[in-house]
């Protein structure tokens, strides 16, 4: 499947070295002002070639909107958009066209479909995530109308973990580091991996909060069983390249605690803690939504590796090309976009939760 969402549905298409990648965002309400500066800024945050800590492949990533927008406002019809691939170097992959790169999707794609586009991984490449970021920008325009903000940053590179979380600093950091004090050590870890022709894993922190200080997020986003907010968040994140684990709130640490240590107590003003990460019973509880996304090391490394070819013969794989030494860095921006898409979808889903909402809509007509 190539579609994410229920009421706000994103369908993507295209391959890493094809002419274009593209998307169709269906379900966007009409009347939303299109913020082209926001769209451009989101694409630049994900863009490669900005520094030594990410892939040298720098695409222009100009988003060409083909439908669903008229006179700078959404029309309520599907928003179609394209991004042209202009700097692919397919020759870098000629030597591995009959090999399975270790820990890539080559092996599974070939066995499932009997054919694979070996150029940059084809459809399995994270190049497709540029479309998710563009779609996430449209979702952010919707969320802004109701005062929801999503943001992200890096909390861990290898074993070096942030002790403080500063999302404003992350916006200025070359690696989107949340902790200024740990940033240099995290950068050094990445540089050491590069020197050794290796890669390194990392963890991104994604947060949704109210746009206004001292205000809460909407309560009740999500549904209690088969459209749980935390389940949909995890589904979206796990559907992105390189993600191996997703935590909501305390996540894995929750299994080590007693109920008396974990429970979020309440008083008349609200919750006294947020170990649940803003989700209870599959629905938002008004607190900040906290998501940690764990990325494996980039499988594309420049060391000789043992593998097999498409005929099952053992051989050596030595990669060329341009690759991220740590996919968590740009991946954090993609996950922020995915959280925006999930929340926007849940906002639209919530319109059907009470008859009063429908009466309000139709009585106005």
UniProtKB/Swiss-Prot annotation:
Amino-acid positions noted as binding FMN in the UniProt annotation, renumbered to this chain: 123-125, 241-242, 281, 296-300, 322
Chain's role: This reaction introduces a second double bond into the aromatic ring system.
GO terms of biological process kind: amino acid biosynthetic process; aromatic amino acid family biosynthetic process; chorismate biosynthetic process
Enzyme Commission no: 4.2.3.5
CC annotations in GO: cytosol
Organism: Helicobacter pylori (strain P12)
Pathways per UniProt: Metabolic intermediate biosynthesis; chorismate biosynthesis; chorismate from D-erythrose 4-phosphate and phosphoenolpyruvate: step 7/7
This protein's encoding gene: aroC
Superkingdom field: Bacteria
Pfam family, one: Chorismate_synt
Name recorded for this polypeptide: Chorismate synthase
InterPro entries: Chorismate_synth, Chorismate_synth_AroC_sf, Chorismate_synthase_CS
This protein's UniProt keywords: Amino-acid biosynthesis, Aromatic amino acid biosynthesis, FAD, Flavoprotein, FMN, Lyase, NADP
Needed co-factor(s): FMNH2
